[in-house]
Amino acid sequence: MARTKQTARKSTGGKAPRKQLATKAARKTPATGGVKKPHRYRPGTVALREIRKYQKSTELLIRKLPFQRLVREIAQDFKTDLRFQSQAVVALQEAAEAYLVGLFEDTNLCAITAKRVTIMPKDIQLARRIRGERA
């Protein structure tokens, strides 16, 4: 059927508004006794806000004590009773976080290249292989 162009027509009044029926009025009030639903942002809004927040910030994202325990645990395999200066642990943490951020940036690019927005283990493997870290 062919499309026809619609022209504006002048309104000639229309019907008067009717009174609400009792059933409609009862339906509009919440039946749960006025319990308000908690506000939820649309999917992705909070994620984008977090991305902007963490891109602006420079503080360390991994907690200091768990990272320190991990460093000491790994160092135990090489030599027992090793001591660390506090600045040494902070330097290791800075380097580790910088490495991880770079790896996740490359991983995200791999996912985007595959026309996806979700990163997968195969993206991390590809990013490391391209970097020459893993054959």
From Swiss-Prot:
Gene3D superfamilies given in the database record: Histone, subunit A
Modification sites for Phosphoserine: 11
Gene name of this polypeptide: ch3-IV
Residues recorded with modification N6-acetyllysine: 10, 15, 19, 24, 28
Pfam families recorded: Histone
MF annotations from Gene Ontology: DNA binding; protein heterodimerization activity; structural constituent of chromatin
Compartment annotation: Nucleus; Chromosome
In-chain residues carrying the UniProt-annotated modification N6-methyllysine: 5, 10, 28, 36-37
Keywords tagged on the record: Acetylation, Chromosome, DNA-binding, Methylation, Nucleosome core, Nucleus, Phosphoprotein
Post-translation changes: Acetylation is generally linked to gene activation. Acetylated to form H3K9ac (11%), H3K14ac (17%), H3K18ac (11%), H3K23ac (16%) and H3K27ac (7%). H3K4, H3K35 and H3K36 are not acetylated. H3K4me prevents acetylation. 32% of the histone H3 are acetylated with, on average, 2.4 acetyl-Lys. They are all continuously deacatylated and re-acetylated with a half-life of approximately 2 minutes. Monomethylated to form H3K4me1 (81%), H3K9me1 (16%), H3K27me1 (25%), H3K35me1 (25%) and H3K36me1 (5%). No methylation at H3K14, H3K18 and H3K23. Methylated by a protein complex that includes Mut11. Set1 methylates specifically H3K4. H3K4me1 is associated with silenced euchromatin. Set3 forms H3K9me1, while H3K9me2 is undetected. H3K9me1 is specifically associated with silent, multi-copy transgenes.
Phosphothreonine found at: 12
Residues marked Not N6-acetylated (site): 5, 36-37
Originating organism: Chlamydomonas reinhardtii (Chlamydomonas smithii)
Oligomer and partners: The nucleosome is a histone octamer containing two molecules each of H2A, H2B, H3 and H4 assembled in one H3-H4 heterotetramer and two H2A-H2B heterodimers. The octamer wraps approximately 147 bp of DNA.
Similarity annotation: Belongs to the histone H3 family.
Keyword rRNA processing: no
Summary of the function given for this chain in its UniProt record: Core component of nucleosome. Nucleosomes wrap and compact DNA into chromatin, limiting DNA accessibility to the cellular machineries which require DNA as a template. Histones thereby play a central role in transcription regulation, DNA repair, DNA replication and chromosomal stability. DNA accessibility is regulated via a complex set of post-translational modifications of histones, also called histone code, and nucleosome remodeling.
Name by which UniProt lists this protein: Histone H3 type 3
SMART domains (UniProt xref): H3
GO CC annotation, single: nucleosome
InterPro entries referenced in this protein's UniProt entry, alphabetically: Histone-fold, Histone_H2A/H2B/H3, Histone_H3/CENP-A
Region (Disordered) residue spans: 1-40
